[in-house]
Amino acid sequence: MESMPSSLTHQRFGLLNKHLTRTGNTREGRMHTPPVLGFQAIMSNVTVLDNIEPLDFEMDLKTPYPVSFQVSLTGFLMLEIVLGLSSNLTVLALYCMKSNLVSSVSNIVTMNLHVLDVLVCVGCIPLTIVVVLLPLEGNNALICCFHEACVSFASVATAANVLAITLDRYDISVRPANRVLTMGRAVALLGSIWALSFFSFLVPFIEEGFFSQAGNERNQTEAEEPSNEYYTELGLYYHLLAQIPIFFFTAVVMLVTYYKILQALNIRIGTRFHSVPKKKPRKKKTISMTSTQPESTDASQSSAGRNAPLGMRTSVSVIIALRRAVKRHRERRERQKRVFRMSLLIISTFLLCWTPITVLNTVILSVGPSNFTVRLRLGFLVMAYGTTIFHPLLYAFTRQKFQKVLKSKMKKRVVSVVEADPMPNNVVIHNSWIDPKRNKKVTFEETEVRQKCLSSEDVE
């Protein structure tokens, strides 16, 4: 198809040259054929055939990202919406059902984080899906600016809430008797966090100029331009100057605070696993020494005669006390291991999810945005939204009080299902959660008494 127009142009150029040479040789041709007309005829013939490139540009505007990129990001974002909403709403429902869970300061701070995760799942993640699937033709500057505002809100609010939970845990571990973070101070801290988050939400709109008349006039004049220029202008990324310091400040405070918490619990990070096998033979020696003590006391008591019961009592009490001490030491070591693992999980999850997008924001501010950095930023944003799934697992489902409440609710649910749907033919199903021993004893004793009564009547 491309060879045919080129051949036609060559033929037309040949005919024009022949015509110009013929008319140029005569006097009439020299007088009546100026060179401007020949140049205009040539240019008109050349420009008639160039009508293909604008169509390709419009096709590129309709598909801003590859289809595989759109499908993968949309799938991950939908999964985060489903898992994040289900887990966070479950946690909030259980917190609201039990009044004793809301009474403490640490639970209120944790609930604030779960409320934020619900808002991110409802507002921020769906808007990211719209931006990924949105064609760039038309004026989409308002949607893009709103998306940047949601990203700014999510990053600042998440970092601030994680920082508040870290300070609360430090206050519990280091100063359990006289706590600094009281209920009134906690409410003031949460209020300041929400105010800071709302201000970070407004910064992209102020930056774009939607609240001023000049900004509105500029948006009306730039309505015909493609909206991909929104993401490639450096002046629209200055709101990242507030997100980057908050992230690094939160990361440093988390590292220092959890190190202090481990020190308060006498947990050494380097020699924690090497100190356990050294103490075990000492425990065995003490146990063996205590086991030899009752033998010697038994020998002395057998020789003593009347003093035997008193010596046996003292030896048994010593053995019981030593067993309790060993059990307490083991529980303490298990508690320390659990705290150490949870601290590592909390720190690593926050850093793994939010470090890539923060580093990329720093690169954008230093070098400038491009199409590649815009796509990479959307991928890192999916990683950052993964905290909506990890927060309930790290801060709620690992707590013992929350686990007890969840188990009790599940028990009541199972009991109601068993009572509402009885089996036919009077078949009794014993539930393992509803004291099976007590029910079995009662039924067994009743049948045994009936058999005895029947046997006694037969004998009589």
Swiss-Prot record:
It is found in: Cell membrane. The chain crosses the membrane at residues 75-95, 115-135, 145-165, 186-206, 236-256, 344-364, 378-398. Residues 276-286 have a biased composition (Basic residues). Residues 1-74, 136-144, 207-235, 365-377 are cytoplasmic. It comes from the Eukaryota. Residues 96-114, 166-185, 257-343, 399-460 are extracellular. Residues 287-305 have a biased composition (Polar residues). One of its GO terms (biological process) is cellular response to hormone stimulus. InterPro entries: GPCR_Rhodpsn, GPCR_Rhodpsn_7TM. SUPFAM superfamilies: Family A G protein-coupled receptor-like. Keywords: Cell membrane, Cilium biogenesis/degradation, G-protein coupled receptor, Membrane, Receptor, Transducer, Transmembrane, Transmembrane helix. It is a multi-pass membrane protein. Residues 276-309 are annotated as: Disordered. PROSITE patterns: G_PROTEIN_RECEP_F1_2. Disruption phenotype: Morpholino knockdown of the protein leads to defective left-right (LR) axis formation in the embryo. Cilia number and length are reduced in the Kupffer's vesicle (KV). Morpholino knockdown of the protein in Kupffer's vesicle alone is still able to generate the phenotype, indicating that Gpr22 regulates LR asymmetry through the KV. GO terms for cellular component: plasma membrane. GO terms for molecular function: G protein-coupled receptor activity. Belongs to the G-protein coupled receptor 1 family. Orphan G-protein coupled receptor that regulates cilia length and structure in the Kupffer's vesicle leading to the left-right asymmetry development by establishing a directional fluid flow. This is G-protein coupled receptor 22. The lineage of its organism: Eukaryota, Metazoa, Chordata, Craniata, Vertebrata. The gene is gpr22a.
